[in-house]
Amino acid sequence: MKPAARRRARECAVQALYSWQLSKNDIADVEHQFLSEQDVKDVDITYFRELLAGVATQAEKLDQLMAPFLSRRIDELGQVEKAILRLAMFELSKREDVPYKVAINEAIELAKIFGAEDSHKFVNGVLDKAAPSVRKGKK
């Protein structure tokens, strides 16, 4: 699968996770609604589904994993930043085939697209601190 298809999968996953966080609907319903309403022709659907299900089922663990690296409590994070950080923490902790620099850079790009003005700086700071601990020194 092309890297662009994975990037699109991450973009779609962040949007769907944002919707899930706000609506508190079942993740399967959010996925179904998202896929039926959005243009997903250039998306790695398998990866999108893995990210969505992985983050949704492990959100609490991912929050605990990132908490030591945050400058504020998780419930004080914006919903967009929370979705992006959860996705990146999932990739860092569960997808060792994704180089940690790729996971961080993709999260920064997502924050530039979807986040508030300087959220990409916040995301970068959190992930730069978290990556060595989460990956235990693996590059």
UniProtKB/Swiss-Prot annotation:
Gene3D superfamilies the UniProt entry points to: NusB-like
Protein family membership: Belongs to the NusB family.
Key word DNA-binding present: no
Alphabetical list of InterPro entries matching this protein: NusB-like_sf, NusB_fam, NusB_RsmB_TIM44
GO terms (BP aspect): DNA-templated transcription termination; transcription antitermination
Protein name as catalogued: Transcription antitermination protein NusB
One GO MF term attached to the UniProt entry: RNA binding
RNA-binding among keywords: yes
Keyword vocabulary terms for this entry: RNA-binding, Transcription, Transcription antitermination, Transcription regulation
Species in which this protein is naturally found: Pectobacterium atrosepticum (strain SCRI 1043 / ATCC BAA-672) (Erwinia carotovora subsp. atroseptica)
Pfam family, one: NusB
Function field: Involved in transcription antitermination. Required for transcription of ribosomal RNA (rRNA) genes. Binds specifically to the boxA antiterminator sequence of the ribosomal RNA (rrn) operons.
Gene Ontology CC annotations of this record: cytosol
